């Protein structure tokens, strides 16, 4: 059971690294601003519609940036895998860290949804400025990474990783990511 818990922790770290990579790619084109602009992108039905600069940049990422929609989908899917994997990690006996990671991942997800300025528009949560949502998203994501690394180091101190163990955890992470 200890080795399974360690394997799940390693898989969570690999998912987290992929979340960081896709998030970094998305951050190059994202504009965390609540300023109202007219849409000028490639999607014809929305051309000229007034929207926040953040939502405009999300549409640009989805339609105009090469691989942008794929990166958004991967980022979202990996975040879901991270949350589900954390639940499994908790069931395997890592309660203290798993609950913290799950809570921080929830805060990061809420910050991500808030910074996109699409789902929360018109709700009481839309009163929070978009840069605050984006900052919350980034801070919570960094905190998740710190907790995962601390937990992984403590597990590895008890049971050192082997090359086969790392290969197995990388392979299982790839299978989960590519599963339809």
Predicted regions and their residues:
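Membrane-embedded alpha-helical bundles that constitute the cytochrome b-like, heme-associated redox core
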Residues: 1-180
